[in-house]
Amino acid sequence: LVGVGTFDDGKGGTYQLPIGWNGNSNGFRSREEGGINQYDFNVAFNVEDRMYFGITLGVNDVDYTRSTYYTEDLYDGSHSGFYEMRNMYRTEGSGINLKLGAIFRPIEESPFRFGFAIHTPTWYSLTDVYSSEIYSELNYKYENEDDNKQFKANERTIDYAGEGVQDYRLVTPWKFNVSAGTTIGGMMALGAEYEYANFGSSRLYYNDGTPMDNQNEYTKSTLKGQHTLRVGMETRISSAFSVRAGYNYSTSAFKDGAYKSLNANDMRTDTEYTNDLARNTVTVGLGYRGKWFYTDLAYKYDVYKSDFYAFSDAALQATKVTNERHQLLLT
């Protein structure tokens, strides 16, 4: 629990240092709900069964809520105490984008094909609503130097920052995709694709269209291009059943030393942030195709590591987190 003090340097100037008590233990909890729902509207056609073209209009609906709780026990010699901080954050809005793609089968007698796709940025119009609450209890113990008596004092503080509302626009990066695939003997299908997006090129604007220059420079300095590789195969083991397997690898979109930036006059106090590292995803599945009925069963395993920080501090060591997700999907 610190503040910043201004001190005289003895030479007619001043300098600043953090002041306060040392935290000797802390805890953090976070709850997230919602996300982004996307609705796609597609048009596709082919030329002589050799060239295939498609366009997709994507409409995104955003409804995301996050609440966090941070607590820290404090100790400074004979003084002690604790504080608790709660943050509530919600984002609502909508976005729109286009996806353009083409697939070519260059040799008529061969099943080999290759393709490419371009995804435009998603143009979002968003509203953030946030609030915070802090509770602290500090116990002081000190001596009166005149009569050498000890005194104790207790201080309780409850502060609530009312709701803050921010309307703004977000433009996500372009995405570029190339792919290739073939079939072997009519029994096995193989495919691979590569995708690139430079998240450092994301842009924020005020609701009137004015660029947020400081935030955009910060985005450019902390985010980078992300590379994604996907490979997959499907084998027909009988006239009705097929087995599938796939692998997805994505590099981190965060540069080394990336941090969360809050302005000094910002009402938000959710200082924690997480830098996700490379992500690995493995999928296996079984499919059934009958005359009147079909179904697919898949198992998906997703794992990636993260560096978690309760707040931005050059001396603060990251908390290493391993994230794992197991999903069983039936369609």
Which stretches of residues belong to each language-model region?
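Outer-membrane beta-barrel porins/channels
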Residues: 1-331
